[in-house]
């Protein structure tokens, strides 16, 4: 649906011009919204036209700005620790023995040898988005009991989605060759559950376009509506 247009549609016989704009934001956390709309209508004895243009834009509100709500580890607040075992720097296998990476932070290391990863701060609480909509309604009376009409509606939306770096399991086949200068073991090392944080967080661009066109005749013919 075209954002904010419902009330405008009810003003089908509107005469005149109406312009609205709005802005709101906060600095803690950082977030803002911008809205704008134009409503124009014209009427005559035989015809009418109504045009509505609607705009909405909001910035991203990242989970990293949400304090305790932006972490997967809720244990300090009486909840559960939902951090992922697909960690960074993770763990690896040496001669078949599971070995946690020595750079794993102490509070992320588990007794089973995994290195937990807090994916919470990488989420988007509110993703950035932009919406532009248009509705046009046109009527023309072609007879005493017959009216031609046309309705046009268009909508263009953009947004994004995202999350932490891709979680990889042991079957991803990641290895460090024995010839690698940073491999002190002199043999190929199999990497366990891991996240390629260096590659950055996942982000997807979302875009959609919608068009609706309806035209016809409205009236009475031989006692039929």
Residue positions per predicted region:
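Surface-exposed beta-strand-turn/loop segments characteristic
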Residues: 1-215, 221
């Amino acid at each position: 649906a075209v954002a904010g247009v419902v009330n405008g549609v009810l003003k089908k016989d509107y005469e005149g011009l109406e312009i609205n704009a709005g802005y709101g934001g906060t600095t803690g956390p950082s977030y803002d919204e911008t809205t704008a709309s134009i409503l124009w209508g014209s009427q005559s004895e035989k015809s009418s036209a109504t045009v509505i243009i609607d705009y909405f834009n909001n910035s991203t509100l990242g989970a990293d700005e949400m304090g305790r709500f932006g972490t997967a580890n809720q244990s300090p607040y009486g909840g559960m620790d939902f951090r992922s075992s697909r960690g960074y720097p993770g763990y690896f296998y040496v001669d078949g023995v599971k070995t946690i990476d020595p750079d794993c932070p102490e509070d992320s290391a588990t007794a089973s040898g995994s290195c937990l990863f807090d994916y919470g701060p990488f989420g988007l609480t509110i993703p950035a988005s932009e919406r532009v909509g248009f509705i046009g309604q046109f009527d023309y009376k072609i007879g005493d009991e017959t009216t031609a009409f046309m309705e046009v509606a268009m909508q263009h939306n953009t947004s994004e989605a995202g999350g932490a770096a891709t979680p990889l399991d042991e079957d991803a086949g990641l290895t460090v060759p024995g010839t690698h200068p940073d491999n002190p073991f002199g043999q190929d090392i199999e990497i366990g559950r891991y996240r390629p944080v260096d590659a950055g967080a996942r982000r997807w661009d979302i875009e959609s376009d919608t068009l609706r066109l309806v035209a016809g005749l409205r009236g009475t013919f031989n006692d039929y509506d």
